[in-house]
Amino acid sequence: MDNVEQAIVRIARSSDLCSISRIYARSMRELGKESFEWLRAVLRTRSKRIVTLVCELNGEVTGFTIAYKKRNAAYIESIAVDESARGKGIGSMLLSELEKTLAKKGVEKVYLSVKSWNIAALNFYLGKGYGLKGVVFIMTGDPDYMTTRYIPGYTVMEIAASRLKKYRIRPTTWWSNLVEDIDLSIYKKFYKEERAIIVKKDNRVKAVTTYSVNDELVVDNISLSSYNAIEALEATIMALRNIAVASGSRLIEIPVDASKRQLVKLIKEYGFKVRDSEYLLMKDLSTNH
C-alpha cells in the first residue's frame, strides 16, 4: 500500500489506448477476448453512459476500468491492473473511484461478472460489498458434430452489427439488459468487426444475435421475442452452425443465464456443453454512499 499515495485515478484519454491494451492483453484470461479495435472504439465513443478511468502510478498507467451506465444502474465491463503493480491497492482505488463517479451520476446499483475459476477476483468483490445475483453458463459446441434440424417458416439475414436497430426483444443473458444499447452505439460509429443475424417469421423479428468469428465463433448476445420462442432459438443455432462451418471455426460459444432452464436444455440438445460459467454480482450504492 506504500505506493498508493503516488497513484492517481483520472478519466481515460485516447492517448491511454496503448497502455490499456497492454494491460488488457496480459489480463485476457480474466477479462475475455475483446480486441484492440474494440478498446479503441470504446475510448473514441463520446457517451455520458460510458465511464473509463485509469490509474497512474509514478506517471505510468498501471490499471483501468470501463463501466456502462443505464438509468440508475451500471455494469462494470472490466477492471484490470498490470501484473507489475498488483498487490499495491490499485484495484481497490479504481473500484472506489468508479463507484463514487457512478453514484454522482445517479447510479444506485452496480453489476459485474466474474469467471467462476477466478476465486481471487470473487473474494475481492465480495470483500467490497458485492453479492451474488445469478450465474451465466458459457456453453460450447463443435459445429462439425452438432445436431442439425430444419426449422420451417423462418428466414435468416446476416448483417454487420452496425446496421442493427433496437428491437423489443429479450436478451438471454442478464448483463445484456445494461450493455446492449451502448454496444449498438459503438458498433454503428467505430467497430465494424461485429456481425449479427436476424431471425424472422411472418416478417416479424423473433431473434437477434451478435457475434464475432475467427478460430471460434463467439456469441455476445442472443435476444428472443420471448423466452418461449424455442423455434426461433433453434433457427438461430442452425444459422450459427452454418456460419461457423463456412468460416472454419472449430467451436461455437454461447452465453446463457443458468436460470433459463428451457433454453439451456435446448442448447444442450444440439450438442453444446457447459465449458465455463460466470458469477453475476451486484452492489447497492444507495446504502454505501
Identify the function of each model-found stretch.
Residues 111-114, 131-144, 273-285:
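Conserved catalytic-core motifs of GNAT/GCN5-like acyltransferases
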Residues 54, 60-68, 75-80, 198, ...:
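Conserved beta-strand in the GNAT
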Residues 68-77, 86, 212-222, 274-278:
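A conserved beta-turn-beta hairpin within the catalytic core of GNAT-like acetyltransferases
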Residues 92, 116-134, 258-276:
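Conserved active-site alpha-helix within GNAT-family acetyltransferase domains
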Residues 17-21, 28-57, 61-66, 174-196:
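Active-site rim helix/loop that mediates acceptor-substrate recognition in acyltransferases
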Residues 132-216:
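Amide-forming acyltransferase catalytic core, primarily the GNAT-like/NAT-type
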Residues 102-113, 246-256:
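Conserved GNAT acetyl-CoA-binding A-motif
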Residues 81, 87-100, 123-127, 229-242:
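Conserved acetyl-CoA-binding loop-helix of GNAT-fold acetyltransferases
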